């Protein structure tokens, strides 16, 4: 009987510890890209509402593609302005969609979903973000891009860079 109580206590401790490391999603939204594809001049805008808590956050860019996307990679340009501070960040992401063996790295069957780390940032309670994202490919119109999204997650633990 004592061993089973100890086992249950250990299991509960493990579950609580793992649960404490979870990230809380503060914002998650997609913008649809109209046919025939994502135009280089079509910058997508996201207005992330004020965060409820001060803390460390992780910004992710997300893509949904279909079989019509013609390349193995895509380069994304992400610019962010934290309001009211006015601090701006500019990130260039070189995103691999298909590996060297021709295997799609996204999740899905007819549409493939990808997530790419943009940056970690420290935000204060009430900070909001205006974010713009565009592609930086030589081809003007990128077929096969269905949706572009942004996810902001609050990080519970770990170190953060504030670049």
Question: What is each model feature region?
Answer:
Residues 29-51:
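Post-signal peptide N-terminal segment of mature Sec-exported envelope proteins
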Residues 61-68:
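Short amphipathic, basic-aromatic surface patches that mediate peripheral association
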Residues 17-20:
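C-terminal motif of bacterial Sec signal peptides marking the signal peptidase cleavage site
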Residues 1-10:
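Bacterial N-terminal signal peptides that target proteins for export
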Residues 92-122:
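An anionic, turn-rich surface loop/hairpin at beta-sheet edges
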Residues 22-25:
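Bacterial signal peptide processing site
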Residues 53-61, 121-137:
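Noncatalytic modules at the cell exterior or secretory-pathway interfaces
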Residues 70-77, 144-146:
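Short coil-to-beta strand junction motifs in C2/discoidin
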